[in-house]
């Protein structure tokens, strides 16, 4: 009865679809798990199915008025709350603003425009401060009829327990490489795509379907991945002068990412991925290596990395992510990290 195009997460999908069929849709949901596991994709399919009026047939039908409005981002009863750009800095604000939650509360209290559910989705729920969290808690504690709020976060520990307790928590897990491979092979419209590339992307995704799909849809992203890994090996063998030169190359390579730190975090993802593979090779677990296209380089350079050094670099990357969230200059963050490689 459903038409959801999702890779993996079968238990979560069954749970949500059952809630729709049995008229047990909750007021609050928390989708939690690392990026690229399909949290936002599942949320969209869930919302689309709740709103769909194209009966009989699978939901969402994609053709009824509600489906068309939602697909085009025009449904008046669906609200997306995201961090906004700070006019002074030109960068995303550190937190979701209290005024945004107050505005959401006002909208949810109004009558529905299309005699449907009123739905709010907050894709970066980890960016609540104390005031916004308290304001949202009041909405969750006193939900209006036929209202659904979906929070999405990479880590439930970043949310107040009071918020978590008011939501049905659904934990998204990594997806098997074979399942991702099969999903990619079933996609249409990608010329020159074959089984060997699907296998490579499935391995590179490390259980994250969204990462594999992004590589497939965006060739530039794949080129950046290749550049990031090559730069990593280059940096580990370079002197300080060469390292600073490479920093400039990385900044130039990611020059379009000065406002959105997402791509710099992708750089860190790629470095963590190769470090994980070095650990696997050093531990004689070669079949588990994700970056199979860099296996020769991994094997050649593995002795440059002790287990302690790998752990130290991983800790440094996590610290760098924290600095980026605090809006510290990207170049300074990279310099601090790379000097200690």
Which functions belong to the PLM regions below?
Residues 1-131, 300:
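Clamp-loader machinery-focused feature within the broader ASCE/P-loop NTPase space
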Residues 1-49, 57, 69, 146-147, ...:
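Charged, glycine-rich active-site and insertion segments that engage polyanionic ligands
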Residues 110-113, 142, 189:
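Secondary-structure boundary motif
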Residues 120-123, 147-153:
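Structural recognition of the conserved hydrophobic beta-strand(s) that form the central parallel beta-sheet
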Residues 128-129, 143, 158-159:
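Catalytic P-loop NTPase motifs of RecA-like helicase/translocase cores
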Residues 130-134, 261:
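Conserved strand-to-helix beginnings and helix N-cap segments that scaffold or border functional pockets
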Residues 134-151:
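Conserved catalytic/switch belt of AAA+ P-loop NTPases
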């Amino acid at each position: 009865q459903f038409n959801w195009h999702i890779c993996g997460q079968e238990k979560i999908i069954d749970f949500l679809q059952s809630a729709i069929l049995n008229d047990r849709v909750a007021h609050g949901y928390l989708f939690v798990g690392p990026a690229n596991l399909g949290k936002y994709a599942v949320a969209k399919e869930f919302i689309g199915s709740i709103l769909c009026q194209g009966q009989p047939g699978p939901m969402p039908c994609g053709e009824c008025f509600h489906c068309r409005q939602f697909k085009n981002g025009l449904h008046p009863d669906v609200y997306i709350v995201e961090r906004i750009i700070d006019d002074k800095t030109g960068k995303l604000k550190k937190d979701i603003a209290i005024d945004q939650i107050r505005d959401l509360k006002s909208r949810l209290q109004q009558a529905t425009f299309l005699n449907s559910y009123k739905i709010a989705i907050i894709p970066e729920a980890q960016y609540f401060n104390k005031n916004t969290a308290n304001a949202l808690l009041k909405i969750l504690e006193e939900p209006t009829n036929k209202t659904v709020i979906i929070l999405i976060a990479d880590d439930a520990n970043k949310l107040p327990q009071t918020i978590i307790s008011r939501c049905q928590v659904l934990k998204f897990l990594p997806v098997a490489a074979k399942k991702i491979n099969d999903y990619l092979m079933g996609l249409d419209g990608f010329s020159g795509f074959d089984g060997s590339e699907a296998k490579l992307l499935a391995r590179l995704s490390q259980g994250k379907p969204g990462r594999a799909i992004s590589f497939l849809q965006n060739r530039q992203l794949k080129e950046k991945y290749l550049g990031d890994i090559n730069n990593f090996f280059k940096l580990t063998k370079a002197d300080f002068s060469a390292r600073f030169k490479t920093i400039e190359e990385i900044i130039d390579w990611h020059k379009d990412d000065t406002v959105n730190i997402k791509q710099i975090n992708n750089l860190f993802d790629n470095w963590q991925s190769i470090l994980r593979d070095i650990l696997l090779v050093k531990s004689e677990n070669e079949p588990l290596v994700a970056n199979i296209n860099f296996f020769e380089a991994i094997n050649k350079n593995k002795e440059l990395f002790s287990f302690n050094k790998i752990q130290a670099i991983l800790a440094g990357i996590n610290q760098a992510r924290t600095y980026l969230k605090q809006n510290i200059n990207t170049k300074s963050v990279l310099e601090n990290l790379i000097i200690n490689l």
